[in-house]
Amino acid sequence: MDIRAAEISKVIRDQIASFGSEAQISEVGQVLSVGDGIARIHGLDNVQAGEMIEFSNGIKGMALNLEADNVGAVIFGSDSQIKEGDVVKRTGTIVDVPVGKGLLGRVVDGLGNPIDGKGPIVAEQRSRVEVKAPGIIPRKSVHEPVQTGLKALDALVPVGRGQRELIIGDRQTGKSAVAIDTFINQKTANAGTDESKKLYCVYVAIGQKRSTVAQLVKTLEENGAMEYSIVVAATASDPAPLQYLAPYTGVAMGEYFRDNGMHGLIVYDDLSKQAVAYRQMSLLLRRPPGREAYPGDVFYLHSRLLERAAKLNDANGNGSLTALPIIETQAGDVSAYIPTNVISITDGQIFLETDLFYQGVRPAINVGLSVSRVGSAAQTKAMKKVAGSIKLELAQYREMAAFAQFGSDLDASTQRLLNRGARLTELLKQPQFQPLPFEEQVASIFAGVNGYLDSIPTNAVTRFEAGFLAEMRSKHADVLAAIRDSKDLSADSTAALKSALEAFVKTFA
């Protein structure tokens, strides 16, 4: 084997030329103690609050408690692989996640890493999980509707783009189902090319079973909703710090749409579990406990998250981010600490009741306790016209139904009120994963409030509605199109609806 001296000297010369004299300096500390997902670290004197740190085995953490002689950090992973004396280094970055349209259709964990086995994420940019919410000047009042596809919501508790509407109720009352139906209902709007009508969806699953999240993703895929949705999952088996972080990760992804003139919708399912995870972290970090052992800043935990949902004005791109936080109550107790906090932060609440659910009223919305503080400004003119009287009639029905239990001899007007109320309640029922387009909701509610259902037996209302809407689609598609395009109920449309209803009532048996 011949050795060429010239070649060797050239290689050595190239290596010398490309030799970098600057050393890589990183500030390091040592683990003093570790346990329960918390590490106490000596050193790291210049670390920032909320900064990402890296342990020697590659596991990431976040510095939260900056004390005189040590740093308290939470660990985003298993603490069993970290031991006393391990070296920890600063990364110099505050926790950030990938954002952009490249995330649509993907399932990620609380740090934005893909967990769906579809390869790496193509992200246009990264964004900090903790940023300040928009101030007062960049905002605009809520005026565009979010069509949920649920008659009971769009008519009685309307949600506008940029609103925060709480979904609250006991376990197994259909809270997540309301949110998923809203996602599925965006399919037609998102299939078009008009960016102002599209609504990109983010679903944050906090502390749920993996099987539940898998079922959710399957449902969204089967209904064609996954292509415009992002799922952020911090499941029950994930460490508490990831369950605490996941909502902020989700809102950072949603803010990308809001800040770029698009519209986003985010669901936090559910914030009770995030508060529990934060309580666990705070107690282990030895922060002083308050009411129900939650830390003193648990209100700020949720307020700084929900304030990031906003409707921006024209100068800031006209985008919006709508939030539907979910809170689980215990035995219908809405006066507990976390429910009252979140009720006071949001712009209204949808209250779901176990009793209604078991009576077969689904979605199990208690119309009397549910309110939307800003949504009525976002309701379309057509829906306002038909839904104006339904609220009053249902309120009177609830009041009368309570009295009617005592007396059997009711006068004709009371009897009429009770009959109408029973049929309207029946009309607002809707099967899961079958959201209705806005124009069909208008036609359906129009039939109810104008007395066309009064002669129909209560148990036939659902059949009547299905038959009537099928008739409208096949023979009166132009009327539905007129309502959809104008978003108003003109005199011509009203007359056409009346004649169609009169004809259908005669043939219905």
Swiss-Prot record:
| TM stretches of this protein | none
Report keywords, A-Z: ATP synthesis, ATP-binding, Cell inner membrane, Cell membrane, CF(1), Hydrogen ion transport, Ion transport, Membrane, Nucleotide-binding, Translocase, Transport
Q: Where is it predominantly found?
A: membrane
Annotated CDD domains = ATP-synt_F1_alpha_C, ATP-synt_F1_alpha_N, F1-ATPase_alpha_CD
InterPro entries (alphabetical)? ATP_synth_asu-like_sf, ATP_synth_asu_C, ATP_synth_asu_C_sf, ATP_synth_F1_a_nt-bd_dom, ATP_synth_F1_asu, ATPase_a/bsu_AS, ATPase_F1/V1/A1_a/bsu_N, ATPase_F1/V1/A1_a/bsu_N_sf
Q: Pinpoint the site Required for activity.
A: S370
Q: How does it sit in the membrane?
A: Peripheral membrane protein
Q: Name the Gene3D superfamilies for this protein.
A: 2.40.30.20, ATP synthase alpha/beta chain, C-terminal domain (1.20.150.20), P-loop containing nucleotide triphosphate hydrolases (3.40.50.300)
Output the Gene Ontology terms for molecular function: ADP binding; ATP binding; proton-transporting ATP synthase activity, rotational mechanism
- Catalytic activity annotated for this protein? ATP + H2O + 4 H(+)(in) = ADP + phosphate + 5 H(+)(out)
A GO cellular-component term linked to this record: plasma membrane
> Which subcellular locations apply to this protein?
Cell inner membrane
> For binding ATP, which residues are annotated in this chain's numbering?
G169, D170, R171, Q172, T173, G174, K175, S176
- EC main class here is translocase
**According to the UniProt entry, what is the EC number of this protein?**
7.1.2.2
Q: What does this protein do?
A: Produces ATP from ADP in the presence of a proton gradient across the membrane. The alpha chain is a regulatory subunit.
Q: Which PANTHER family has this protein been placed in?
A: ATP SYNTHASE SUBUNIT ALPHA, MITOCHONDRIAL
Q: Which NCBIfam families match?
A: atpA, PRK13343.1
Q: Which family does it belong to?
A: Belongs to the ATPase alpha/beta chains family.
Assembly, per entry:
F-type ATPases have 2 components, CF(1) - the catalytic core - and CF(0) - the membrane proton channel. CF(1) has five subunits: alpha(3), beta(3), gamma(1), delta(1), epsilon(1). CF(0) has three main subunits: a(1), b(2) and c(9-12). The alpha and beta chains form an alternating ring which encloses part of the gamma chain. CF(1) is attached to CF(0) by a central stalk formed by the gamma and epsilon chains, while a peripheral stalk is formed by the delta and b chains.
HAMAP family assigned to the protein according to its UniProt record, in alphabetical order: ATP_synth_alpha_bact (MF_01346)
UniProt-recorded name of the protein: ATP synthase subunit alpha
> Which species is this record about?
Rhizorhabdus wittichii (strain DSM 6014 / CCUG 31198 / JCM 15750 / NBRC 105917 / EY 4224 / RW1)
